[in-house]
């Protein structure tokens, strides 16, 4: 089993723009992964690439780089910064622009109640 768990959560920004929230979690006991762990890591099925994707989780910069690359077909890609919100780092639409900060509240996990 891969030590990087990915979850896609349908969500929307505070302004009501729909997007998909890609949350990752590192499941090792010490919270450490190796570069080899991204080999074969696939995005969850059912992602709607006609919407944007916000990536969120605590992990190394090279994991973020890999996930941004994998999410490239999406309308836009943002990285969550807890101090700012979602910072758009790539876009294929006029809806948002690179460097734009989208305000959002973190969604609950799909499997959680409430």
What are these language model-derived features?
Residues 54-64, 84:
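Gly/Ser/Thr-rich loops at beta-strand to alpha-helix junctions
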């Amino acid at each position: 089993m891969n030590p990087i768990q990915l979850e896609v959560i349908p969500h929307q920004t505070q302004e009501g723009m729909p997007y998909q929230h890609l949350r990752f979690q590192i499941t090792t006991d010490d919270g450490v992964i190796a570069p080899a762990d991204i080999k074969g890591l696939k995005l969850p099925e059912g992602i709607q690439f006609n919407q944007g994707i916000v990536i969120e989780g605590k992990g190394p910069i090279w994991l973020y780089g890999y996930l941004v690359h994998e999410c490239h077909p999406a309308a836009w890609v943002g990285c969550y910064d807890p101090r700012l919100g979602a910072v758009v780092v790539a876009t294929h639409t006029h809806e948002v622009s690179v460097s734009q900060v989208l305000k959002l509240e973190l969604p609950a996990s799909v499997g959680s109640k409430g």
